[in-house]
Amino acid sequence: MTIKFLSESTINRIAAGEVIERPASVVKELVENAVDASSTKIDIILERAGKNLIIISDDGIGMTDKELEIAVERHTTSKFDESDFLNINTFGFRGEALPSIAAISKMLITSKKRDADKAFQIKLIGGNEKQVTISVHNEGTKIEIRDLFFATPARLKFLRADKTELAATVGVVKKIALAHPKISLSLTHDGKNLLKLKGQNKDAETNLKQRIIDVIGDDFIKNAAYIDFKTPDFSICGYTSSPTYNRASSEDQFLFINNRPVKDKLLQVALRVAYQDYLARDRYPICAIFLQINPQLVDVNVHPAKAEVRFHDPNYVRNLLIEAIKNALTNKSHVTSTTIASDALELFKNPLVNKQSPVSKVINVNSKSADYRPTTHSTLNTVPQNHVCQKLIDTLSHAKIEQEVENHIEHEQQTRKQYKLGAAKAQLHTTYIISQTEDSIVITDQHAAHERLGYEKIKDYLKTEELIKQRLLIPEIVELPNEKKADCLYDHREKLYKLGLTLEKFGEKSIIVTEIPNILGDVNVQKLIQDLADHLSDFGKNIALTELIEHVTETYACHYSIRAGRKLSADEMNALLRQMENTPLSGQCNHGRPTYIELKLKDIERLFGR
């Protein structure tokens, strides 16, 4: 076969294969064109998730008849100066979208230039039969795409179910909406309105906040830290969730470079690193983060879809993003997720019914230990009764609540006002500390809280020097499940020595431990070594030192911390609460779980119909 030139229609279909993968790709390209056209209102209509019909209408600057003819040709654009290719500020610039879409669909474009007398229309079928005619239309542009991929039926086979394709399109529209809070956007599918977002016209921070509430939700804003970070060439702003407010996937992570939504591995890794001290490895933060960068320091022309970028100095960008996120999280360091308390209260919000219900007499809880037993000496006949509340009362009626705090009332009131986590009042099930503030009660998980305190303490110590070792009076021999785990620990023995642990191989599956970190005190060495082996065996010999330190520090913190089941005195409980108030990120343990929940008095009163 001889070498020959491809036809224009074939070239366009090949280009479409790079740019247009699914209906969501069409919506992305056309809506971004509308944004570049200075639109303030964009409406999107879909049928069968865009497979049958896609209509994009805007109130942008519009096109003349001459511009319409040129716009559907390849490599035509009005969006940048050829002499300044490195300074691109628009979304589109390759001049490929319209001809690529036209090549695989039936396209109708109607447009009217601002302040023009006439509107014009152009019709294309498979990229051919270009006819420009006079039409009637408001200022702006309307593009109709019918029978997507009719000219490339093989591509149709790769499309997913309507529900999946629609979800992809909704995701695309949400990203564009977040990047442009001043633009009103609507999305309708098969006659049903899915999104209706009003343009915001206040200051930039307020606009962004309201658009995030509209797109991601009010709960996210309530549980997010605001990012505001600037250097001469970079600015980073947006919101990122508290560690306790997380997801099982990275689906709700929205990252933007110069308002362009991107899916960049470098930024995703930076996000993971910023949260590595606060989240379990299978949990993901939620965020909407916007990086504004000098256009000459980033290349957006890496791929036709423009979802990937290349930075002039990637490590610098990575470190800046990590620093910006960590600074924001530190400023919100003592806050736990507000939804935790709401979820707890929801358990009690069963429909209330009026029924005969006994009301117990007042119990004096000032004694060192008081039994709570409801009695029936009441003249009240109709009290709203919540089934879940009653279940809790029934459980507590058989338990002793240890009253550990017997300070003077005046001192207690002062403590409640002075400290965020209040004054310790009791310990439940030797696991949870109950404390009281001016307007709430706080329930603290003593193990999770102390684990975070220990983690921060050990981490700070490792920044300055090696951990002090304590020699075991009798060396501990630890037998592991298999030789692989024993070999893994032995392979890392030099690094572990710097982290306060001295060990040697003892047979095929055993390790002998002679020294442990002094900070761990009277620790269960058997359990410590087994947990370390479990952590490290998954990574083998190639684990980086920083990652090894992270794993070891997590394990140490867990074994250093107060265990559930340990009885604490009033002074010990208050000391723990005061330490939490003075420790960064004490609102969650190392795995992203909350260390405490706060129940507001007004919410508790609502449970009792007050």
From Swiss-Prot:
Gene3D superfamilies: 3.30.230.10, Histidine kinase-like ATPase, C-terminal domain (3.30.565.10), MutL, C-terminal domain, dimerisation subdomain (3.30.1540.20), MutL, C-terminal domain, regulatory subdomain (3.30.1370.100). GO terms for biological process: mismatch repair. Pfam families: DNA_mis_repair (PF01119), HATPase_c_3 (PF13589), MutL_C (PF08676). It comes from the Bacteria. SMART domains: DNA_mis_repair (SM01340), MutL_C (SM00853). One of its GO terms (cellular component) is mismatch repair complex. Keywords: DNA damage, DNA repair. Signal peptide: none annotated. The keyword DNA damage applies. One of its GO terms (molecular function) is ATP hydrolysis activity. Belongs to the DNA mismatch repair MutL/HexB family. PANTHER family: DNA MISMATCH REPAIR PROTEIN MLH, PMS, MUTL, DNA MISMATCH REPAIR PROTEIN MLH1. This protein is involved in the repair of mismatches in DNA. It is required for dam-dependent methyl-directed DNA mismatch repair. May act as a 'molecular matchmaker', a protein that promotes the formation of a stable complex between two or more DNA-binding proteins in an ATP-dependent manner without itself being part of a final effector complex. This is DNA mismatch repair protein MutL. It comes from Rickettsia peacockii (strain Rustic). The gene is mutL.
